[in-house]
Curated annotation (Swiss-Prot):
Modification after translation (UniProt): Hydroxylated on proline residues in the S-P-P-P-P repeat.
Distribution of this protein across tissues and organs: Expressed in roots.
Gene Ontology molecular function: any one: structural constituent of cell wall
Role played: Modulates cell morphogenesis by regulating cell wall formation and assembly, and/or growth polarization.
Organism: Arabidopsis thaliana
Superkingdom, natural source: Eukaryota
Residues carrying sugar: N83, N319
Protein name: Leucine-rich repeat extensin-like protein 6
Keyword vocabulary terms for this entry: Cell wall, Cell wall biogenesis/degradation, Glycoprotein, Hydroxylation, Leucine-rich repeat, Repeat, Secreted, Signal
Annotated compartments: Secreted, Cell wall
Amino acid sequence: MREDTFFFQWWFLVSGLSFIFLLPQAFTYHTPPINPCFAHPFLPPITNPRLLKAFTALQAWKFTITSDPNGFTSNWCGPNVCNYTGVFCAPALDNPYVLTVAGIDLNHANIAGYLPLELGLLTDLALFHINSNRFQGQLPKTLKCLHLLHELDVSNNKLSGEFPSVIFSLPSLKFLDIRFNEFQGDVPSQLFDLNLDALFINDNKFQFRLPRNIGNSPVSVLVLANNDLQGSCVPPSFYKMGKTLHEIIITNSQLTGCLNREIGLLNQLTVFDVSYNNLVGSLPETIGDMKSLEQLNIAHNKFSGYIPESICRLPRLENFTYSYNFFSGEPPACLRLQEFDDRRNCLPSRPMQRSLAECKSFSSYPIDCASFGCSPPSPPPPPPPPPPPPPPPPPPPPPPPPPPPPPYVYPSPPPPPPSPPPYVYPPPPPPYVYPPPPSPPYVYPPPPPSPQPYMYPSPPCNDLPTPVHY
């Protein structure tokens, strides 16, 4: 055998053995870990079909989780999904004898991962709270199968994409919170036609204008802050929300225009915050009709004029912040509030105000609220009446008059003549004494006895006639 041939065979044999020796290690390194929930072949079967679907959904979700530093999902194993951390079971609405997964609450768990399509299997879910985590991606479209979902809170995550249109397929939804995410683009106007109680879409990257139908929303809390409203003004329909709206926050959202006097119709408001915008004009005096108002923040705008006194006399107002504007007058009632901030205005005799040149420069440009395309606002409130002029100095006192003559003393009248003694009337006559009544009535004597009847004498028997016999 040739030497080169022998060397080739020997090299091939050694190389093959090395490859065979290293092959298991290579494949073992790339093999995914075995899910411990399926490592036991003798798990009891799940006879409840609804809990079986929930088991499938939760195991698929756990598989997408990339980080769980606090171990919230460490016990998501086995068929008893009702014992999983953050999973809550309750009797089904259509069958109280069947147990279902009715709620998921993983708030503040700091979990990283994605939301899988299998979440659509949780058809009995009424509450889904996963705020303050690190979930990425988009809301799965399969959430449209959750017809019983009442509350959806995915706030403070890293969700992205356009506004999740799956929201419009949830007929039972009342509470929607998608704030502090990375959603972007337009906000559909039909969002404000939904029958919601609370709506939070603040602190995203939305770019939209306030729609004309915003007044159709029956929400009690509306937060749109820290988005780009693209210079939109407040639509007239906004003031139709007076019966339900309690809190509205639209800070730092490029809001422009003037506030209409109809804002006083929002008489249920407790919080009104439109700070850090480009609102102009004067404050409507009708804000004084919002008797429930507790927090009023209009700072960092371009309001001007005189602050109506009725605002500062609201019975429940605790904090009124109107700093960084161009107000030129404030009533003393504002200075008696529990908390107020009037810095950086044009208020005379108040500390920390704008310079006189800055105030004159701003007032040299007239404000035309109609130019913003909003409904014409009410005329600005009249300035307070000037203080009355000081009274004129009193005239010098006149010279003292001469002393009056002594009063004339009339002589006393002569004494009246003595009056005659009073007439003494004679005593009245004695009362008439009537004579006594007559004696008893006269008693007549009895009549004399009547005379005896006269008896004629009978004739003698001899004088009788003799009867004649025939």
